[in-house]
Amino acid sequence: MSEKIAVVPGSFDPVTFGHLDIIKRAADVFDIVYVAVLNNSAKNPLFSVEERMALMAEVTKALPNVRIESSSGLLIDYAKEKKAKAIVRGLRAVSDFEYEMQITSMNRFLDETIETFFIMTKNQYSFLSSSIVKEVAKYGSDVNELVPDCVVQALKEKYGFSQ
């Protein structure tokens, strides 16, 4: 029997508890989960791809079936390269669904053998985004309940609040 492989893509700039929840839930369902840290040329990231990968590796180290990699090409090509049969995306709101449906439709057009699975975020993460975390952290406010400890520290260092 072949392994069930999935890809969880995102910029993860930075990784939040919402992202981590989706990754953990995907890891419960699939044999191997590739977390694809995307290098999106349309975004101006706070953290480099290498920094985001290191933070992701730290926060997922207790998940033995999760692999952290980066990708800068088409997601569907990355999924095919990894022999994934699924792309897993987290949804917070209806607005997320509309955007994700466009991406899913294009991915299906490019390769109809790879399915997209949407996982609804837990209620406590429904408002959470990396952009909101960065905005709050930039002004020195507490983000301990939004991101893992290593991310809190990395944000403090980026914004000059470290001891």
From Swiss-Prot:
This is Phosphopantetheine adenylyltransferase. It is found in: Cytoplasm. Keywords: ATP-binding, Coenzyme A biosynthesis, Cytoplasm, Magnesium, Nucleotide-binding, Nucleotidyltransferase, Transferase. Its cofactor is Mg(2+). It catalyses: (R)-4'-phosphopantetheine + ATP + H(+) = 3'-dephospho-CoA + diphosphate. One of its GO terms (molecular function) is pantetheine-phosphate adenylyltransferase activity. The record marks 19 as: Transition state stabilizer. Pathway: Cofactor biosynthesis; coenzyme A biosynthesis; CoA from (R)-pantothenate: step 4/5. It comes from Lysinibacillus sphaericus (strain C3-41). Belongs to the bacterial CoaD family. Substrate binds at residues 11, 43, 75, 89. It is an enzyme of class 2 (transferase). The gene is coaD. Homohexamer. ATP binds at residues 11-12, 19, 90-92, 100, 125-131. Its EC number is 2.7.7.3. CDD domains: PPAT. GO terms for biological process: coenzyme A biosynthetic process. GO terms for cellular component: cytoplasm. Its main location: cytoplasm. Reversibly transfers an adenylyl group from ATP to 4'-phosphopantetheine, yielding dephospho-CoA (dPCoA) and pyrophosphate. Transmembrane segments: none annotated. InterPro entries: Cyt_trans-like (IPR004821), PPAT (IPR001980), Rossmann-like_a/b/a_fold (IPR014729).
